[in-house]
C-alpha cells in the first residue's frame, strides 16, 4: 500500500543515467505510450521564469538553446510572480502533509532533522482557508497556461537559478536557497504537466 504525502502532487517518477533507459521505463510505466516527433516551433522559453537567473547560468542556458535549436520562441507564461507560485505550491503541499503525515509524526515522534522539522511546523499553521485560496490560484494559473501555450508546447528552462550551494551553510541560509529554487521546480507540479530534469550546466565553481 502506498500512503499519500501530498495527493495534489504525489506522482510517479524515475531516474536514469541515459536517455535510452529513460524511454524504456516510460513505456513500462505509462499507459497508451505513443512516440511523437517534437517540432522546434513547439519548444518555448518562458521569459518570466528565467528573468532573474544567475548571470552565468542564464548565459549558458541561452548559449545552449542557440547552439541546439536556434531562435526559440519566447513566451510570457503567467501573470503571477514566481514567488506567488512557489507559495501556492508550499501551502497546498503543506496542508496535505498536515492531514496525511503529521498525525503519524505526533503518534510515533520519530527523530527528524531540524530543517525538516521546521517545515512540519510551518505545515501545522496552514489553515483550510489558506489551502482553498491556494487551490483557486492554482486553477487560475492552469487556466492561464491553457490560454498562453499552444497545444503540444514544450517549455525549456533551468530548474535552479544558480549552482548547488556550498556544503556547511546554516539551516536558515539553506532554507532561503530552497525557497528560491522552489520558484523554478514548482511549475511542473502546479501545472499538472510532466517534466524531465537533466543536469546540464555548471556554475562559476563548476558545481552542477
Regions found by a protein language model. Name each.
Residues 1-46:
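Fold-level recognition of mixed alpha/beta catalytic cores in primary-metabolism enzymes, strongest
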Residues 9, 17-24, 56-60, 92, ...:
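Conserved active-site and cofactor/substrate-binding residues in soluble primary-metabolism enzymes
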Residues 20, 27-35, 66, 70, ...:
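Generic secondary-structure signature for well-ordered alpha-helical cores
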Residues 22, 101, 156:
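Residue-level signal for inorganic ion chemistry
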Residues 28-94:
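Gly/Ser-rich, acidic/histidine-flanked active-site/gating loops
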Residues 58-75, 102-107, 130-152:
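Acyltransferase
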Residues 88-137, 199-207:
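Short helix-loop capping/hinge segments that flank enzyme active sites or metal/cofactor-binding pockets
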Residues 132-208:
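Glycine-rich, small-residue loops and helix-cap segments
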Amino acid at each position: 500500500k502506498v500512503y499519500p504525502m501530498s495527493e495534489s502532487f504525489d506522482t510517479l517518477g524515475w531516474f536514469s543515467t541515459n536517455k535510452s533507459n529513460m524511454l524504456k521505463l516510460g513505456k513500462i510505466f505509462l499507459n497508451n505510450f505513443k512516440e511523437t516527433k517534437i517540432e522546434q516551433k513547439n519548444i518555448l522559453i518562458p521569459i518570466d521564469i528565467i528573468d532573474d537567473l544567475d548571470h552565468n547560468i542564464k548565459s549558458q542556458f541561452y548559449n545552449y538553446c542557440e547552439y541546439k535549436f536556434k531562435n526559440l520562441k519566447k513566451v510570457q507564461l503567467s501573470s503571477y510572480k514566481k514567488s506567488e507560485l512557489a507559495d501556492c505550491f508550499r501551502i497546498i503541499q503543506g496542508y496535505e502533509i498536515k492531514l496525511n503525515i503529521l498525525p503519524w509524526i505526533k503518534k510515533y515522534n520519530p527523530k527528524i532533522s531540524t530543517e525538516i522539522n521546521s517545515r512540519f511546523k510551518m505545515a501545522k499553521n496552514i489553515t483550510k482557508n489558506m489551502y482553498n485560496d491556494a487551490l483557486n490560484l492554482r486553477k487560475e494559473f492552469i487556466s492561464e497556461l491553457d490560454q498562453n501555450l499552444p497545444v503540444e508546447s514544450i517549455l525549456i528552462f533551468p530548474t535552479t537559478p544558480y549552482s548547488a550551494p556550498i556544503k556547511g551553510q546554516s539551516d536558515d541560509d539553506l532554507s532561503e536557497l530552497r525557497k528560491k529554487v522552489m520558484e523554478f521546480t514548482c511549475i511542473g507540479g502546479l501545472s499538472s504537466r510532466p517534466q524531465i530534469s537533466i543536469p546540464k550546466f555548471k556554475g562559476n565553481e563548476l558545481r552542477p
